[in-house]
């Protein structure tokens, strides 16, 4: 039986660093694709005031990104949630680990492990002001689609 040696199994620090760098970059690309598909799902159903909070530079966070948006009615909040699910699943095959808030559809949270999605009614979003909880995060506003 022939022994095949893979460079990332060697113990040199340079090789470990390169392997870590490669895997980190791959994870970042996967996360970026996930965030992109989440935004597409929101925009497909006219979700508004999309904000992406990048938490990657903050220690001890529960995830790497928050994607926050709003719908104008409980039914729109539910439809946005379904659209996100479809958009992500078609592109990546991923499903959220959990979805909470469907019962009253005032605030629905979707957990994609590294990315948490929050879909609010405007008054609920204003009350909780979740963006302010992460004021030290890099916040990116995504323009509304008319």
Model-predicted segments: where are they?
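Switch/connector loops and helix/strand junctions flanking conserved nucleotide-binding motifs
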Residues: 126-129
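Polybasic/polar functional segments that serve as interface/processing modules
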Residues: 10-62, 70-108, 122-123, 133-146
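Conserved acidic residues
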Residues: 64, 114
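Active-site beta-strand termini and strand-to-loop segments that position acidic
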Residues: 110-112
């Amino acid at each position: 039986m022939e022994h095949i040696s893979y460079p990332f199994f060697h113990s040199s620090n340079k090789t470990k660093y390169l392997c870590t760098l490669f895997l980190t970059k791959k994870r970042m690309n996967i996360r970026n694709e996930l965030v992109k598909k989440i935004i597409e799902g929101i925009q497909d159903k006219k979700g508004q005031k999309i904000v992406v909070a990048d938490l990657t530079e903050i220690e001890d966070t529960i995830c790497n990104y928050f994607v926050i948006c709003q719908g104008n009615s409980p039914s729109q909040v539910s439809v946005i949630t379904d659209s996100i699910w479809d958009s992500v699943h078609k592109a990546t095959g991923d499903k959220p680990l959990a979805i909470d808030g469907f019962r009253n559809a005032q605030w629905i949270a979707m957990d994609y492990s590294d990315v948490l999605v929050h879909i609010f009614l405007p008054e609920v979003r204003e009350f909780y002001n979740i963006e302010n909880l992460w004021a030290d995060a890099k916040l990116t506003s995504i323009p509304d689609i008319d």
